[in-house]
Curated annotation (Swiss-Prot):
Catalyzes the attachment of alanine to tRNA(Ala) in a two-step reaction: alanine is first activated by ATP to form Ala-AMP and then transferred to the acceptor end of tRNA(Ala). Also edits incorrectly charged Ser-tRNA(Ala) and Gly-tRNA(Ala) via its editing domain. The lineage of its organism: Bacteria, Bacillati, Actinomycetota, Actinomycetes, Propionibacteriales. Its cofactor is Zn(2+). Zn(2+) binds at residues 578, 582, 681, 685. Consists of three domains; the N-terminal catalytic domain, the editing domain and the C-terminal C-Ala domain. The editing domain removes incorrectly charged amino acids, while the C-Ala domain, along with tRNA(Ala), serves as a bridge to cooperatively bring together the editing and aminoacylation centers thus stimulating deacylation of misacylated tRNAs. Its main location: cytoplasm. It is an enzyme of class 6 (ligase). It comes from Cutibacterium acnes (strain DSM 16379 / KPA171202). One of its GO terms (biological process) is alanyl-tRNA aminoacylation. This is Alanine--tRNA ligase. SMART domains: tRNA_SAD. The gene is alaS. It is found in: Cytoplasm.
Length: 892
C-alpha cells in the first residue's frame, strides 16, 4: 500500500465518522515558540488550549512536520529523520476516550480491501497509564484499559506504564492528560517477547491517543508538573506516524525503504556508483541525502529560503549536508536539481504545491549549491591547514578562534567544521566559538530581538483575550465611541491606571489597525474624560486581541467610555502604500514570472519594501519596465475591492497567500483589476489605484539566498523624490555645461579620464618605489646565518608595501634572506616581513617574525611563512621593531 494511499485512507475513515478534513498547515506555522511545525497537533493548539474557539467539533489531518533536533543522527540509524507526516484525529469537547479507542481499533484492524489498514489484531499491543503514578488515577487509567478490553485486546497485551511513557503535555503550561499508545509486534526476529515494556524495536509504536483532561499550571519535566484543575472541555488529540505505518504495511525494514523515500536513495546510488547495502559509511550518506532532500524540498515549497538565521539556516544546513554527502560518495558535479526532482515527483500526489512552487524551489536550491561549492573549495583548504597545524602541535582540539574565522570569513557553518574535524579525530572548542559568535551578535544586533511595543508576555495577553476578542471596525470607521475592557500595566491586567503610566488599553471595539501583514500600525488618539491620550503603537499580541499602547495623561479605568480617533492622514498614507505593494507584486509576477512570489513586505505612509523569491537581480531595463507597469496600473485607476469568502474558495480562484501565514476559515480577498492582483489580505487599502498618485522605484538588492528586495516611494514622497532627482540633473548639467541627454556620456568620459590618470599615477609610483630597491638591498646586514634586508620606507603602505617587499625578495632570492620593511603613516606604522625559500628552509618564518616585530609598535600581525604583515599605533617603537626581528633571526 503506497504511503499516499495510507494517508488518504486515514482521513477518509475519520471523515466518515463526522470529522472535517483539515489540510496540512504550512511548516512555517505562525507560532513564535517553534521554528517549524513539529507535531500534528500544532495547528490545533489554540483550540486545544482554549485560547480560540474551534471552527469544528471534530477534525482530521495529515500534517507535514520537520524536526531537526537529532539531525546529526540522521542516516546513522534508520529511526531518525527530519521530515515526517503525522496523521491525527481531534475532538474539541465532543467525543472522548471510549469513542477514540473504538475508532482507532476499527481503522487499524479493518481489512485493507474494506478501506482499513489491515493489521492482524493478534499483533496489536497497547499501553495505558499504570497504577500509582498519578493522584487522579490511583489504579491507573481503568477507563482506557476497559475500552481496549472491550475492543478485543487480551489483558496480557495491555500494559500499564509510567507518566514518562503514558502521560502527555506540551512541555509548557496548558492541557495535559493520560495517553494510550498502539504498538505492532513485528515478530521474534526483531527482539525478545514481553511487549513494549520489554523491547520497542520489536514492538513498534504507530499511534498515540491523548486524552486531555487537565489544565497544567507548571511543567518541569515529563513526569513533574502541577495541575491547576480540570479542563473546561475534554479533548482528544491523536498522532500516528505515516512513514512508520507505511514501512510496516510495505514489508520493508525502515522508513528509508518506503515508496516516498527509497527512489531518492536509488538516484543517489546511480549518480555515485555506490550500491546501497554494500558499505555502512556509504549507506549512512545515502540515507542523509534521501532524508535531507525531502526536508529541503518541503521547506522551500513552503517559502523558506537558505540563509544564516533561524529557518533559513536550518534549510541551508540540510542542503549543504546533501552536497557534502554526495561529494563523499564521489560526486563533484551539482546534485540538487536531479535529487530534488525525484523527491518532487514522489511527494506531488500528497502535496501538489511541490509542483506549483517548483521554479522557485529549484532556483533557490541551485543558487545555494553554487554558493556552497565555492565555500567548500576555499573553506576546506583552510580547515585542512588548521587540522594539520592542530595535530602538529599535539592537540586534539581545533581552536574556537579558527572555527569562528572559518564561519565569519569563509561562510563555513560550525556544524560542518565539527563534522569534518571529527572525521580527522579532532574536537572543536565549541565554547570559545559560541562566545565569539555571541560577541559578534551583540555588536551587530544590539536590541534587535526586543519585541516592538509589547510590554508584557503572551500569558497575560491570553488572559485578557479570554474575556473576548476585539472587533476591528477600521475598514469603514475612523472614529468609534467604545468602552475600555482591559488595561495591562507592568505585565499585569489591572482595573485602573494613574497619570504618567505607559499602559496597553483593550477596547470593546476599535478603528485602529494593529501592525500586521507588513502594514504599520495606525496613529491617533484615545479621548477619555476630556483628555487625549496619544496612541504610540497598536499590536495584536495574540489572535483576536488588539492592544493600544498609550502614555496616560490622566486617570483611566476599565469600564470608562472613550472615543478612539484614527489619524486620517496617516491612515490614508498607509492605504496608499499597502495598495501599491499589491501593485508591485502583480507587476513582478507579470514581468519576472509567477515564481516571483512574496517573501515579506513592509509599508507605511509614503514608503514600501517588498521581498520576493528570485535567484538573480533585476536588470536596469527590467526595473524601469516594472516601475512603468506600476504607474500604468495607477493611471488606469483600477477599482480595489474586498470580499469575504471561505479559504478554500479563495485558493480555488487563485488568490495569492503568504507562505507560513495562518488563515481563518473565512478570509478577505483584495482584488485589483480582477485576476491581475488577487490576494488574501487583512490590510487597509485605497478605493482605487489612482489614489496612490504615483510610484517611484528606489532600488533592488539581495536580502538572502533566493530572495530579492525592491523599495519604492509612493504619492507625494515619490513626487518629492523625482523633484530632487530633477534638481540634481539640472545642477550637474550646469556644472558640466551639457544638455541633460548628454550628461551620461559626459560623466562616463570623466570617469574614463580619471581611471587613466590613476593608472599613470600608479605606474609612476611603482617606478619610484622600485627605484629604492638597489639602495635598500645595498644596506643588507648579517643576522646570524641570515641576510637581513631592513629599511624604513615612510609613506609606503598596503599593496605598495607588498610590491616593494616582493621585488626586494626577488633580488636576493638565491640567499637565505629576510626582508623587513616599516612604512605607513607617522601615527600608524605598517610592517611587512618576507622570506626567501632558503631562509624558510633554515627556520625563518615570516608569520612568526611579524609577531615579534610589531610588538614594539603596539600592533598585531599575521600571515604565511613567506610573507606576513602587521600594523601598530606607536611610531616611537620603529627602531626597536627592526632590532627585534634582527635579534630573533640571530637566535635561530
Amino acid at each position: 500500500m503506497r504511503t499516499a494511499e495510507i494517508g488518504q485512507r486515514f482521513v477518509d475513515f475519520f471523515e466518515s465518522k463526522g470529522h472535517t478534513v483539515v489540510p496540512s498547515a504550512s511548516l512555517l506555522y505562525n507560532d513564535p515558540t517553534l521554528l517549524f511545525v513539529n507535531a500534528g497537533m500544532v495547528p490545533f493548539k489554540p483550540y486545544l488550549m482554549g485560547t480560540e474557539p474551534s471552527p469544528w467539533k471534530r477534525a482530521t489531518s495529515i500534517q507535514k512536520c520537520v524536526r531537526t533536533l537529532d539531525i546529526d543522527e540522521v542516516g546513522k540509524t534508520t529511526r531518525h529523520g527530519t521530515f515526517f507526516q503525522m496523521l491525527g484525529n481531534f475532538s474539541f469537547g465532543d467525543y472522548f476516550k471510549n469513542e477514540a479507542i473504538q475508532y482507532a481499533w476499527e481503522l487499524v484492524t479493518k481489512p485493507a480491501e474494506q478501506g482499513g489498514l489491515g493489521f492482524d489484531p493478534a499483533s496489536i499491543w497497547v499501553t495505558v497509564l499504570g497504577p500509582g503514578f498519578h493522584p487522579d488515577y490511583p489504579e491507573g487509567d481503568i477507563e482506557a484499559r476497559e475500552a481496549w478490553r472491550a475492543a478485543g485486546i487480551p489483558d496480557e497485551q495491555i500494559q500499564g506504564r509510567s507518566l514518562k511513557d503514558n502521560y502527555w503535555h506540551m512541555g509548557v503550561p496548558g492541557p495535559g492528560g493520560p495517553c494510550s499508545e498502539i504498538y505492532i509486534d513485528r515478530g521474534p526476529a526483531y527482539g525478545p517477547d514481553g511487549g513494549p515494556e520489554a523491547d520497542e524495536d520489536r514492538y513498534l509504536e504507530i499511534w498515540n491517543l491523548v486524552f486531555e483532561t487537565e489544565d497544567l499550571s507548571a511543567v518541569r519535566a515529563k513526569d513533574d508538573f502541577d495541575i491547576a484543575g480540570p479542563l473546561r472541555s475534554l479533548n482528544i488529540d491523536t498522532g500516528a506516524g505515516l512513514e512508520r505505518i507505511a514501512y510496516l504495511l510495505q514489508g520493508v525494514d525502515n522508513m528509508y525503504e518506503t515508496d516516498q523515500v527509497f527512489p531518492v536513495i536509488e538516484k543517489a546510488s546511480e549518480m555515485s556508483g555506490k550500491r546501497y547495502g554494500a558499505r555502512h559509511d556509504d549507506d549512512v550518506r545515502l540515507r542523509v541525502v534521501a532524508d535531507h532532500v525531502r526536508s529541503g524540498l518541503m521547506l522551500m515549497t513552503d517559502g523558506v529560503t537558505p540563509g544564516n538565521e533561524a529557518r533559513g539556516y536550518v534549510l541551508r544546513r540540510l542542503l549543504r549536508r546533501v552536497v557534502r554527502a554526495m561529494r563523499l560518495l564521489g560526486v563533484a558535479d551539482p546534485v540538487l536539481p536531479e535529487l530534488l526532482s525525484v523527491s518532487r515527483d514522489l511527494m506531488a500526489d500528497s502535496f501538489p504545491d511541490v509542483l506549483t512552487q517548483w521554479d522557485r524551489v529549484i532556483g533557490a536550491a541551485t543558487a545555494e549549491e553554487d554558493t556552497f561549492r565555492r565555500t567548500l573549495s576555499s573553506g576546506t583548504a583552510m580547515l585542512d591547514a588548521a587540522v594539520v597545524e592542530t595535530k602538529a602541535s599535539g592537540s586534539k582540539t581545533l581552536s574556537g578562534e579558527k572555527a569562528f574565522q572559518l564561519h565569519d570569513t569563509y561562510g563555513f557553518p560550525i556544524d560542518l567544521t565539527l563534522e569534518m574535524a571529527a572525521e580527522q579525530g579532532l574536537e572543536v572548542d565549541r565554547n570559545k566559538f559560541t562566545a565569539l559568535m555571541a560577541e559578534q551578535r551583540a555588536r551587530a544586533k544590539a536590541d534587535s530581538q526586543a519585541k516592538k511595543g509589547l510590554l508584557t508576555d503572551r500569558e497575560a495577553y491570553s488572559q485578557v483575550r479570554a474575556l473576548g476578542e476585539t472587533p476591528f471596525l477600521g475598514y469603514t470607521d475612523l472614529t468609534v465611541d467604545t468602552t475600555v475592557t482591559g488595561i495591562i500595566a507592568n505585565g499585569t491586567s489591572v482595573t485602573a491606571a494613574e497619570p504618567g503610566a505607559v499602559v496597553e488599553i483593550v477596547l470593546a471595539e476599535t478603528p485602529f489597525y494593529a501592525e500586521m501583514g507588513g502594514q504599520d500600525s495606525d496613529s491617533g488618539i484615545i479621548r477619555a474624560n476630556g483628555i487625549d491620550f496619544e496612541v504610540l503603537d497598536v499590536q495584536r499580541p495574540v489572535p483576536g486581541l488588539i492592544v493600544h499602547k498609550v502614555h496616560l495623561d490622566g486617570d483611566l479605568a476599565v469600564g470608562d467610555r472613550v472615543t478612539a480617533l484614527v489619524n486620517p492622514a496617516t491612515r490614508f498614507g498607509a492605504c496608499q502604500a499597502h495598495t501599491a505593494t499589491h501593485v508591485i507584486h502583480a507587476a513582478l509576477r507579470e514581468l519576472v514570472g509567477p515564481s516571483a512570489t512574496q517573501a515579506g513586505s513592509y509599508n507605511k505612509p509614503g514608503y514600501l519594501r517588498f521581498d520576493f523569491s528570485a535567484t538573480k537581480g533585476l536588470s536596469d531595463s527590467l526595473k524601469d519596465e516594472i516601475e512603468e507597469r506600476c504607474n500604468v496600473a495607477i493611471h488606469d485607476d483600477f477599482e480595489v475591492t474586498d470580499t469575504q469568502m471561505p479559504l478554500e474558495d479563495a485558493k480555488a480562484m487563485g488568490a495569492m497567500a503568504m507562505f507560513g501565514e495562518k488563515y481563518p476559515p473565512i478570509v478577505r480577498v483584495v482584488e485589483l483589476a480582477g485576476p491581475w492582483s488577487r490576494e488574501l489580505c487583512g490590510g487597509t487599502h485605497v478605493a482605487s489605484t489612482g489614489r496612490i498618485g504615483m510610484l517611484s522605484l528606489l532600488g533592488e538588492q539581495s536580502v538572502g539566498s533566493g530572495t530579492r528586495r525592491v523599495e519604492a516611494l509612493v504619492s507625494t514622497d515619490a513626487f518629492r523624490h523625482m523633484a530632487a532627482e530633477r534638481a540634481l540633473v539640472n545642477e550637474l548639467t550646469g556644472i558640466l555645461k551639457v544638455q541633460p541627454d548628454q550628461l551620461a556620456d559626459r560623466v562616463s568620459k570623466l570617469a574614463a579620464d580619471l581611471k587613466e590618470a590613476e593608472r599613470k599615477l600608479g605606474a609612476a609610483r611603482t617606478r619610484e618605489l622600485l627605484g629604492q630597491v638597489d639602495d635598500i638591498v645595498a644596506g643588507t646586514t648579517p643576522a646570524g646565518s641570515f641576510d637581513l634586508v631592513a629599511a624604513k620606507v615612510p609613506g609606503v603602505a598596503g599593496s605598495d608595501l607588498r610590491t616593494l617587499a616582493a621585488e626586494i625578495r626577488a633580488r636576493v632570492k638565491d640567499r637565505p634572506a629576510v626582508v623587513t620593511l616599516i612604512g605607513g603613516t607617522h601615527d600608524k606604522p605598517a610592517m611587512i616581513v618576507a622570506t626567501t625559500e632558503s631562509a624558510r628552509a633554515a627556520g625563518a618564518k615570516a608569520g612568526a617574525l611579524i609577531k615579534v616585530g610589531v610588538a614594539p609598535i603596539g600592533g598585531r600581525g599575521g600571515g604565511k611563512d613567506d610573507m606576513a604583515q602587521g600594523a601598530g599605533s606607536d611610531p616611537t617603537g620603529i627602531d626597536a621593531a627592526l632590532r627585534a626581528v634582527n635579534t630573533e633571526l640571530t637566535a635561530l
